[in-house]
Amino acid sequence: MSSYPTPVIILIGPTASGKTELAIKIAEYFKTSIHNIDSRQIYKFMDIGTAKPSKDQQKKIKHFLIDIEEPINQINVQQFQKIAQKSIKREINQDNLPFLVGGSGLYMNSITKGFFIPDIPPQNNLRIQLEELGQKKCWELLNNCDPLSTKNISFADRIRTIRALEVFYVTGKPLSTLKVQNPPNWKVLELGLDRDNLKERILQRTKNIFLSGIIEETNHLISKYGFDLPILETIGYREAKDVLKNHSTIDKAIELTTTKTIQFAKRQKTWFRNKNNPIWLNNKNLLKDAIIKIESFLS
């Protein structure tokens, strides 16, 4: 294998910024596939609430790292890192241009920068104590001991909040400060997508998600795995679950989901600027600007 660094293209951006649509156009132009770096799209049966690429989009362009596990089987950052790196290596060995797309900064950096993620088994006693405290208190604890991680973890994401607290309490080190270990021999171009009208896009996408059937999708997940499925505590699904319980209305669920998503997108943008420092694309002509930058990078 060549000792020269392998070129790898990355497209990052906050939720609802239009990554999927732009990524497909880029992949079509460069005749390559897409590796989805997303902490929820890896799970089966969660298509609407995660805004997963449609079946038609997946037929048009091959997508990796989508629907790789059932939601009852939680995948942590370390497990995802291993799965993703293996998939990307396979593409490199076939002389394909690796193209990574996602909004999860921690997951992306674990792959591209080689962050060492400690292999800490679930701490059952600790988890019981944390779950008794409730998500609000756990997120506040995490924000106190590891504020950088909360910039990339939604306030409603109980799974990743508890996992980050486990890492801190077991190792004594915040998850966000874990050092790079054996970074891959890649030459990486990071492109950033950030829309001026992001709040409006988030509101529209949230409406579309509820109109498209997130409540029915949530009901299906509940019937298959039960009300206590942890992933149902994440943004969108939690609000849909409250509607099913008659604790909320659809209008209130849309409003709350929109508010939480806007807050999460703000934290994503802060993470990208602090941890990634991408080249931001020109919003007036995204595809043209992306192609110019990628071709220059590859030449």
UniProtKB/Swiss-Prot annotation:
Example GO BP: tRNA modification
Top-level division of the source organism's lineage: Bacteria
InterPro entries in alphabetical order: Dimethylallyltransferase (IPR039657), IPT (IPR018022), P-loop_NTPase (IPR027417)
Region listing for Interaction with substrate tRNA, in residue ranges: 38-41
EC assignment: 2.5.1.75
Reactions listed under catalytic activity: adenosine(37) in tRNA + dimethylallyl diphosphate = N(6)-dimethylallyladenosine(37) in tRNA + diphosphate
Cofactor(s) needed by this chain: Mg(2+)
Group of enzyme by EC: transferase
Amino-acid positions noted as binding ATP in the UniProt annotation, renumbered to this chain: G13, P14, T15, A16, S17, G18, K19, T20
Keyword line: ATP-binding, Magnesium, Nucleotide-binding, Transferase, tRNA processing
Site feature: Interaction with substrate tRNA: S104
Binding site for substrate: T15, A16, S17, G18, K19, T20
GO terms of molecular function: ATP binding; tRNA dimethylallyltransferase activity
Range of residues in the leader sequence: none
Summary of subunit composition and partner proteins: Monomer.
Family as reported in the entry's similarity comment: Belongs to the IPP transferase family.
Function (record text): Catalyzes the transfer of a dimethylallyl group onto the adenine at position 37 in tRNAs that read codons beginning with uridine, leading to the formation of N6-(dimethylallyl)adenosine (i(6)A).
NCBIfam families xref list: miaA
Protein name: tRNA dimethylallyltransferase
